[in-house]
């Protein structure tokens, strides 16, 4: 089969023929039609995870066929039986085991789910990792409630967009942030109430003046600007962190947290229950993933460059065997 191989970190990905995967007990092989990219794949290419052993086939998201049926795969393996957190055996498709950027991939049989009927395969390939992460952050951890006001940071990325779509479906009042005015306007066209440019000095003061405080924040950046998120929170608000692309949180005033009874919660990926509930939400509200661009398989490096640029609005998808 053909697979996209990372042979060393920070080197061009090459497409080569490798042996078909051989499933072990309780595993099956899925024929991949489309695969979706995530920032995780870029970070693996750059060697930013511990214990990476090259050569490597990355990719956590896919839509394909199994026994002639259209399927997608929950990329969160071995979560365990406790809903509050993952087990010590938890892993994500695409590291350390070979992932979705190949014509075939072996996965646990229990991870296979039917492709939602209203979705095309390329849309299905956009959904699993980002949709699961967004669902858990917004609903399982954030406990989003209809009528609440939510700020979703970094709009344009896959998780942020799914969080926005899910929040809108549930009847929340959605606000977004970005450093790109075009992305803000696109989000507003999709239903967001308004957006702010976090590069603007004292944006948080303007936000509260114009829109009031928020009850919930969904953030994947952290970093030096995190303290401003606290400042726009209403009493008893929740801030859910699902990523840390901007690094350490260094400017945080404890009194602003405990006096307003604010909860700061961590969230990553999700359980099998989260995944099933996410699919139910997507099907009930006929939600379609936002796709930025679909690349042919032989343009895998161009797809990674697009992801690295940060210019995308929505998911980047590869046509493996469309």
Q: PLM features: what roles do these ranges have?
A:
Residues 150, 211, 286-290, 301-322:
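C-terminal capping/lid region of NAD(P)-dependent oxidoreductase domains
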Residues 76-154:
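NAD(P)H dinucleotide-binding glycine-rich loop of Rossmann-like/cofactor-binding domains
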Residues 72, 215-218:
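N-terminal Rossmann-like NAD(P) cofactor-binding module of classical short-chain dehydrogenase/reductase
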Residues 90, 170-172, 178-181, 221-290, ...:
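Glycine-rich phosphate-binding loop and adjacent beta-alpha segment
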Residues 33-34, 76, 110, 244, ...:
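Short, surface-exposed secondary-structure boundary micro-motifs
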Residues 68, 122-200:
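Mid-domain Rossmann-like dinucleotide-binding core that forms the NAD(H)/NADP(H) cofactor-binding site
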Residues 202-212:
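Short amphipathic alpha-helix with an adjacent loop that forms part of the alpha/beta core around
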Residues 19-36, 46-85, 94-99, 116-118:
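Glycine-rich beta-strand-centered segment in the early N-terminal region that forms part
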